C-alpha cells in the first residue's frame, strides 16, 4: 500500500508540474486575450487537480511511513520531470543532466535500503 501511495504521489505531482508548464505555454499564446481566455484553458485546472491529488496521496502516505524515509523518495520527481521535459517539451537533456539523474536514483536507492 505504501509503495502504491508513493507511486501515486510521484505521478500526480509530476503530472502537476507538466500541466503547469503547459499552462504557461498556453498563456503565452492567449496573453492578449486576457485572464478569461487563460482560465478557460484546461491546463491550470489539470495542474490544480493533479497537485491536489498528489498532496492527498502524500498525506495518506505520511500516515503509514516516517517522513524521514518517505521524503527522499520525492527526489524521483526530478527524474520524472526531466524525462517529461525531454519527451513532452523537447528540451535538451545532456550528459550532465543524465549524470545528475543517476546520482539522484542512486541516492534514493541508498536511502531506501536503510529505511
Swiss-Prot record:
Its main location: membrane. Residues 46-113 form the EamA domain. It is a multi-pass membrane protein. The keyword Lipid metabolism applies. The chain crosses the membrane at residues 42-62, 65-85, 93-112. Coiled coil: none annotated. Pathway: Bacterial outer membrane biogenesis; lipopolysaccharide biosynthesis. The gene is arnE. It comes from the Bacteria. One of its GO terms (molecular function) is carbohydrate derivative transmembrane transporter activity. Heterodimer of ArnE and ArnF. It comes from Pseudomonas aeruginosa (strain UCBPP-PA14). GO terms for biological process: lipid A biosynthetic process; lipopolysaccharide biosynthetic process. Belongs to the ArnE family. It is found in: Cell inner membrane. Pfam families: EamA. This is Probable 4-amino-4-deoxy-L-arabinose-phosphoundecaprenol flippase subunit ArnE.
Amino acid at each position: 500500500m505504501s509503495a502504491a501511495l508513493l507511486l501515486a504521489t510521484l505521478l500526480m505531482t509530476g503530472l502537476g508540474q507538466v500541466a503547469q508548464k503547459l499552462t504557461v505555454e498556453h498563456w503565452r499564446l492567449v496573453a492578449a486575450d486576457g485572464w478569461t481566455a487563460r482560465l478557460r484553458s484546461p491546463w491550470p485546472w489539470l495542474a490544480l487537480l493533479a497537485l491536489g491529488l498528489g498532496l492527498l496521496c502524500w498525506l495518506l502516505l505520511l500516515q503509514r511511513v516516517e517522513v524521514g524515509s518517505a521524503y527522499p523518495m520525492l527526489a524521483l520527481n526530478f527524474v520524472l520531470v526531466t524525462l517529461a521535459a525531454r519527451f513532452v517539451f523537447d528540451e535538451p537533456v545532456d550528459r550532465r543532466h543524465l549524470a545528475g539523474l543517476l546520482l539522484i536514483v542512486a541516492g534514493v536507492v541508498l536511502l531506501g535500503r536503510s529505511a
